[in-house]
């Protein structure tokens, strides 16, 4: 009988027979297809190793390509925007991986397809990469360039900058037949670019570097060096310099055998890289002056390390550590394009160079594999907070409360400043003995960071138009304006704040100052003026009346007893931006760290010892432990003497090689015997070592052996009830 929706009914027996036939047919099809599936080739695997895929610069990139074993190498195609560049690739010995550098990338997105020649079925699946290319002048992610920007390469052997426009920037002059600049301007440069320069040097037997031409007869005074791999070679260095991200960069490496600039000799390279950062304090608008001793870091070169450096990674050029991190990534990218991936990259650098290591280790995983920060601080942002208190407090004790005999004993100033003070150190500002770290270490930093009309940059009188130079706001906050933003007054938002700070709180609580002194201090001390209200500094920073405290830019009260002096309120958006942009070290670092410094408290040096432990506390707060960070102090009675850095490099090398050999054990599980907290005497001899030598600083345990020998001090904000970190 017919059923609705069907033309006719199907007998049940016939239906079962039909199902059996269909199932059998499907099984036969699967059996026929299975051998084909089993024989399917593994895919190509392609990886960019010189940078992140979206952070390529300069139009080229190094790739590693894993080729399926059954694919003949001569059939590999590397199509860069459709153009085959397979001839740029060579096998890595002992692997199925090809390495090579592609070029000709256009600005913006580029497509790279790695495949086997042909279009037939059964070929390996291609690898497809999308690479985003940026100019070698930057930026990549740091935001709009800072302008005006004064060039410096003409002072450091790289010639005049390349002309990039006809009307604005740093002038470029016509040269005479002898190569000397004339007075005739042929154009201007805003990017301060230079052609890449490769030269060769040799070290003589007196330890000096001299020019060398590969292939020339061997100089009689040429020294030799033995690398950490035990290879003894002539001390000849290949030295490449140029500009990346508008800053001067340097790559140096031993090259003991004859080579040309494009024929790289890696025979004496130990496979490892030192990235040498540098400190100082500056606020940008300048290409920077390089340090030859860091570019040609003898301890590293002689042992076979490659040494990387950039004026963009010198905080004496600028303190925009987003820009600095970008620059370091770009310089390392250039190195990897030249030489391929290193075994590891370890960083060195003191003061601001130490800050960079903590910040970049946090923000750019993979840039650094190990760090040796020297004389470090956690970051610039939180350091600036208590440093901004220094001159407010010094002016109060020198002038506003000058009649109080307590402050005439200079060591008493530690009670409110937290930083060390001495009754015996000569004070150049008073002509007598007695000084503080605020005076000897930090004087002049407040106007440099805060005063928009105080700063300057070398060569700014040459820049066109001069009206652009006159419009610069010379502050640290304007240096990082891309992140903190611009306020309604037209100035960069400023995070510095002292509203509600109870200066001297722990001192009054412990009875070291009286309640009356505490109340008067907090009523009279004010803060810093808003940027539009600031005026030019006085002597000794600028011609004028004596004002080492920058008091003319402080806020006071006409009658502090009835109306306390107003404080400076920081911008909340700027505070948030400092964290979000990565300018604050939060403790997010997982690489091995040896934090080393000379103990310089008696010198009233700005590199105070509490900073190493501030970083440690942040690491503990973020990670739960600080097993990856070691703290080493070397005594410096009478001034810095023994350099512990070579030993730190040796310990770090053993630590890193353990990690590479046993990655499953992690950073802490691979520590060699000497990778512990330690302290040393002035001759570099170990005084104490172990996990407990710094007890009593970040805990309530009895002082450890090193703690007892090297007292740690605080800051004005710690005295006021703030945290140690």
Where are these regions (language model features)?
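Residue-level detector of alpha-helical hydrophobic segments embedded in or interacting with membranes
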Residues: 6, 30, 37-38, 130
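Intrinsic disorder/low-complexity segments in short proteins, especially the signal peptide
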Residues: 11, 33-36
């Amino acid at each position: 009988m017919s059923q609705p929706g069907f033309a006719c009914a199907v007998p049940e027996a016939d239906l079962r027979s039909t199902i059996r036939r269909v199932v059998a047919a499907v099984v036969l099809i699967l059996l026929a297809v299975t051998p084909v599936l089993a024989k399917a080739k593994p895919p190509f695997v392609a990886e960019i190793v010189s940078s992140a895929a979206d952070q390529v610069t300069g139009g080229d990139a190094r790739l590693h390509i894993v080729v399926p074993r059954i694919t003949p190498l001569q059939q590999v195609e590397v199509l860069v925007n459709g153009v085959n560049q397979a001839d740029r690739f060579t096998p890595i010995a002992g692997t199925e991986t090809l390495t090579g550098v592609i070029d000709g990338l256009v600005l913006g997105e580029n497509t790279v397809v790695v495949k086997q020649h042909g279009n037939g079925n059964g070929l390996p699946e291609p690898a497809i990469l999308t690479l985003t290319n940026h100019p070698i002048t930057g930026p990549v992610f740091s935001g709009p360039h800072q302008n005006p920007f004064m060039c410096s390469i003409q002072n450091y052997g790289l010639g005049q900058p390349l002309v990039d426009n006809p009307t604005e920037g740093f002038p470029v002059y016509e040269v005479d037949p002898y190569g000397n600049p004339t007075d005739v301007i042929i154009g201007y440069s805003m990017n301060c670019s230079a052609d890449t320069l490769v030269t060769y040097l040799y070290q003589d037997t007196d330890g000096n570097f001299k020019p060398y031409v590969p292939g020339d007869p061997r100089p009689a005074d040429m020294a030799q060096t033995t690398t950490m791999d035990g290879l003894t070679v002539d001390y000849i260095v290949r030295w490449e310099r140029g500009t990346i991200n508008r800053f001067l960069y340097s790559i140096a490496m031993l090259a003991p055998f004859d080579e040309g600039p494009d024929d790289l000799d890696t025979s004496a390279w130990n496979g490892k890289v030192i990235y040498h950062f540098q400190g100082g304090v500056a606020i940008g608008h300048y290409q920077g002056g390089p340090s030859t001793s860091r570019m040609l870091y003898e301890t590293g070169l002689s042992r076979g390390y490659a040494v990387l450096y950039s004026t963009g990674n010198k905080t004496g050029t600028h303190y925009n550590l987003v820009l600095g991190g970008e620059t370091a990534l770009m310089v390392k990218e250039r190195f990897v394009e030249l030489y391929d991936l290193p075994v590891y990259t370890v960083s060195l650098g003191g003061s601001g160079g130490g800050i960079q290591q903590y910040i970049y280790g946090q923000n750019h995983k993979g840039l650094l594999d190990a760090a040796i920060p020297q004389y470090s601080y956690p970051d610039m942002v939180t350091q600036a907070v208590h440093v901004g208190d220094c001159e407010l407090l010094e002016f109060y004790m020198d002038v506003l409360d000058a009649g109080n005999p307590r402050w005439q004993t200079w060591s008493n100033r530690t009670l409110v400043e937290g930083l060390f003070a001495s009754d015996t150190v000569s004070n150049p500002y008073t002509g007598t003995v007695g000084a503080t770290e605020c005076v000897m270490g930090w004087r002049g930093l407040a106007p440099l960071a805060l005063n928009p009309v105080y700063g300057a940059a070398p060569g700014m009188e040459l820049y066109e138009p001069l009206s652009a130079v006159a419009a610069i706001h010379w502050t640290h906050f304007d240096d990082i304006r891309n992140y903190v933003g611009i306020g309604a007054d037209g100035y960069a938002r400023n995070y510095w704040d002292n509203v509600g700070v109870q200066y001297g709180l722990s001192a009054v609580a412990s009875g070291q100052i009286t309640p009356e002194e505490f109340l008067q201090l907090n009523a009279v001390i004010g803060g810093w003026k808003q940027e539009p209200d600031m005026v030019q500094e006085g002597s000794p920073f600028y011609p004028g009346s004596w004002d080492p405290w920058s008091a003319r830019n402080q806020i006071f009260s006409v009658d502090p007893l009835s109306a306390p002096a107003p404080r400076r309120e920081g911008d909340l958006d700027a505070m948030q931006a400092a964290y979000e942009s990565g300018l604050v070290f939060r403790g997010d670092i997982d690489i091995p760290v040896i934090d080393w410094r000379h103990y310089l408290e008696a010198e009233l040096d700005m590199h105070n010892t509490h900073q190493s432990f501030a970083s440690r506390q942040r690491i503990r707060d973020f990670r739960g432990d600080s097993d990856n960070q070691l703290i080493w102090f070397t005594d410096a009675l009478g001034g810095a003497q023994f350099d512990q850095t070579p030993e730190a490099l040796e310990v770090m090398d053993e630590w890193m090689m353990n990690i590479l050999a046993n990655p499953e054990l992690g950073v802490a599980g691979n520590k060699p015997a000497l990778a512990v907290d330690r302290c040393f005497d002035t001759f570099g001899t170990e005084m104490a070592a172990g996990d407990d030598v710094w007890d009593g600083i970040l805990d309530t345990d009895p002082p450890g052996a090193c703690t007892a020998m090297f007292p740690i001090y605080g800051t004005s904000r710690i005295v006021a009830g703030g945290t140690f970190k």
